[in-house]
Amino acid sequence: MLNIFSLVCICINSALYSSSFFLGKLPEAYAFLNPIVDFMPVIPLL
């Protein structure tokens, strides 16, 4: 069960990184996604 949860978190994490990469040229969108992108890599390590 923990492995499935970790896999889902990694998928969400990669999706957020790709979306933040495309939205990086928009300062407002990047400022909105920045706290989420900073927090998400911690979740699979828990």
UniProtKB/Swiss-Prot annotation:
Propeptide: 1-24
Keywords recorded for this protein, A-Z: Chloroplast, Membrane, Photosynthesis, Photosystem II, Plastid, Reaction center, Thylakoid, Transmembrane, Transmembrane helix
Transmembrane segments: 4-24
Keyword Transmembrane belongs to the record: yes
Cell compartments where the protein resides: Plastid, Chloroplast thylakoid membrane
The keyword Chloroplast is assigned to this record: yes
InterPro entries, sorted: PSII_PsbK (IPR003687), PSII_PsbK_sf (IPR037270)
Gene Ontology, cellular component aspect: chloroplast thylakoid membrane; photosystem II reaction center
Principal subcellular localisation of the protein: plastid
GO biological process, one term: photosynthesis
Membrane topology: Single-pass membrane protein
SUPFAM superfamilies reported for this sequence: Photosystem II reaction center protein K, PsbK (SSF161037)
Quaternary structure note: PSII is composed of 1 copy each of membrane proteins PsbA, PsbB, PsbC, PsbD, PsbE, PsbF, PsbH, PsbI, PsbJ, PsbK, PsbL, PsbM, PsbT, PsbX, PsbY, PsbZ, Psb30/Ycf12, at least 3 peripheral proteins of the oxygen-evolving complex and a large number of cofactors. It forms dimeric complexes.
Function: One of the components of the core complex of photosystem II (PSII). PSII is a light-driven water:plastoquinone oxidoreductase that uses light energy to abstract electrons from H(2)O, generating O(2) and a proton gradient subsequently used for ATP formation. It consists of a core antenna complex that captures photons, and an electron transfer chain that converts photonic excitation into a charge separation.
Family: Belongs to the PsbK family.
Protein name, as recorded: Photosystem II reaction center protein K
Gene it is expressed from: psbK
